[in-house]
C-alpha cells in the first residue's frame, strides 16, 4: 500500500510541473501563431464560402433519388445541433441564399465550386502551418483530395442520415431500459460527432505524422470546448439580446459571424494542443525561442523537400 502511494506521489510530482510547462508553451505557441487572427480570417472565408459549400453539397445529394429530402434534414440537424440559438433566423437566411443560387448559370455554378475549393484549401494551409509543415502536397494530389471531399463527402453524409432516419423509424427498441439508453446516446451524439470530426481533421489534413493519443486529446478538448461554447453563446444571445436592438432584421449576420469565429478558434486551439503535445522537447522554450524554432522548422522542411525533389530528378 505504501509502495502504491509512493508511486502515485512520484507520478504526481512529475505530472504537475509537466502540465504547467505544457500550458505555458501552448499559450506562447498560440501567441506566435496568432490563433485569434487566423480564426477571424477563416471565419471571413467561411462566410463567403458557406453558401457555395451548402449549394454544392445539396446539389450533389439531389442527383440521387435515395437521398430525397435528406438535404432539408441535414440543414435542420446542423442548425439544431451546431448553431446555438437564433437557429430560425440563420436557417431562413441560409435557405434564401441557397434557393437564390438555383437561378444561377453554369458559369456561376463553376464559381461556387471554386469558392468551396478555396475554403478547403485555406483550412489545409492554416492547419499545416500549425504543424510547421512546409513540404506541400503535389497539386494533383491536393486537388484530388479536395475533389473527393466535395463529392464523396456529401454522399457519405447523406447515406448516414438516410440510414439513421430509416432505423429510427422502425421502432425496433420497445424495452424502456433500452429506450432510455438510446435516448442518452442521442443526447451525446453531437459531442461524439464533434469528437470524430475534429479527430479526422487533425489526422488527415496535416501533411505530417500525428500520433493517435495526441490527436485524441486535441479532439476531445476541442469537442468539449465546442459544446460549452454552444451553451454559453446560446445563453448570451437569449439573456442579452442587445444585438436585435442594434441590427434589427440583420441580426442573423453578426450572430453567424461571431459563432463561426468561435468555431474556428476552437478548431485552431485543438490543433495547437495536438501539435504541442508532439513537441515535448520545446516545452521549456521562451517566446523568442518559439519564434526562431518555428522559422527553423519551416526552413528545414523546405530544404528537405527540395533535396528530395532533386534526388528524385537525378
UniProtKB/Swiss-Prot annotation:
From the record, give the cysteines joined by S-S bonds: none
Matches recorded under InterPro entries = UPF0761_bac, Virul_fac_BrkB
The membrane spanning regions, by residue number, are 41-61, 104-124, 143-163, 185-205, 217-237, 249-269
Predominant cellular place of this UniProt entry's protein: membrane
Q: Where in the cell is it found?
A: Cell inner membrane
Kindly give the Pfam families that the UniProt entry links to this protein: Virul_fac_BrkB (PF03631)
**Topology with regard to the membrane?**
Multi-pass membrane protein
Gene Ontology cellular component?
Answer: plasma membrane
Q: Which UniProt keywords apply?
A: Cell inner membrane, Cell membrane, Membrane, Transmembrane, Transmembrane helix
| Top-level lineage group | Bacteria
What's this protein's family per the entry? Belongs to the UPF0761 family.
Q: Which PANTHER family match?
A: INNER MEMBRANE PROTEIN YHJD (PTHR30213), UPF0761 MEMBRANE PROTEIN YIHY (PTHR30213:SF0)
What is the name listed in the Swiss-Prot or TrEMBL entry for this protein? Answer: UPF0761 membrane protein VIBHAR_00593
To which species is this protein native? Vibrio campbellii (strain ATCC BAA-1116)
Amino acid at each position: 500500500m505504501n509502495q502504491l502511494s509512493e508511486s502515485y506521489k512520484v507520478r504526481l510530482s512529475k505530472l504537475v510541473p509537466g502540465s504547467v510547462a505544457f500550458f505555458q508553451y501552448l499559450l506562447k505557441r498560440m501567441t506566435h501563431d496568432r490563433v485569434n487572427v487566423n480564426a477571424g480570417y477563416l471565419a471571413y472565408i467561411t462566410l463567403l464560402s458557406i453558401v457555395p459549400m451548402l449549394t454544392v453539397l445539396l446539389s450533389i445529394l439531389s442527383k440521387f433519388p435515395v437521398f430525397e429530402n435528406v438535404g432539408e434534414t441535414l440543414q435542420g440537424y446542423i442548425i439544431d445541433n451546431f448553431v446555438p440559438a437564433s437557429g430560425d433566423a440563420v436557417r431562413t437566411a441560409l435557405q434564401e441564399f441557397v434557393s437564390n443560387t438555383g437561378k444561377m448559370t453554369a458559369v456561376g455554378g463553376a464559381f461556387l465550386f471554386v469558392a468551396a475549393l478555396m475554403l478547403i484549401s485555406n483550412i489545409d494551409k492554416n492547419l499545416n502551418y500549425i504543424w510547421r509543415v512546409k513540404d506541400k502536397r503535389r497539386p494533383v494530389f491536393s486537388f484530388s483530395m479536395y475533389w473527393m471531399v466535395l463529392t464523396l463527402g456529401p454522399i457519405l453524409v447523406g447515406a448516414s442520415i438516410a440510414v439513421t432516419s430509416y432505423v429510427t423509424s422502425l421502432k425496433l427498441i420497445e424495452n424502456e431500459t433500452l429506450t432510455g439508453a438510446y435516448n442518452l446516446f442521442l443526447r451525446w451524439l453531437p459531442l461524439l460527432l464533434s469528437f470524430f470530426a475534429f479527430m479526422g481533421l487533425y489526422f488527415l489534413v496535416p501533411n505530417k505524422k500525428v500520433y493517435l493519443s495526441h490527436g485524441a486529446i486535441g479532439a476531445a478538448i476541442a469537442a468539449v470546448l465546442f459544446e460549452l461554447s454552444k451553451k454559453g453563446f446560446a445563453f448570451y444571445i437569449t439573456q442579452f439580446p442587445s444585438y436585435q436592438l442594434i441590427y434589427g432584421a440583420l441580426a442573423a449576420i453578426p450572430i453567424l459571424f461571431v459563432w463561426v469565429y468561435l468555431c474556428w478558434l476552437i478548431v485552431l486551439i485543438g490543433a495547437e494542443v495536438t501539435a504541442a503535445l508532439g513537441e515535448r522537447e520545446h516545452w521549456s522554450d521562451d517566446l523568442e525561442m518559439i519564434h526562431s524554432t518555428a522559422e527553423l522548422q519551416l526552413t528545414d522542411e523546405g530544404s528537405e523537400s527540395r533535396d528530395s525533389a532533386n534526388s528524385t530528378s537525378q
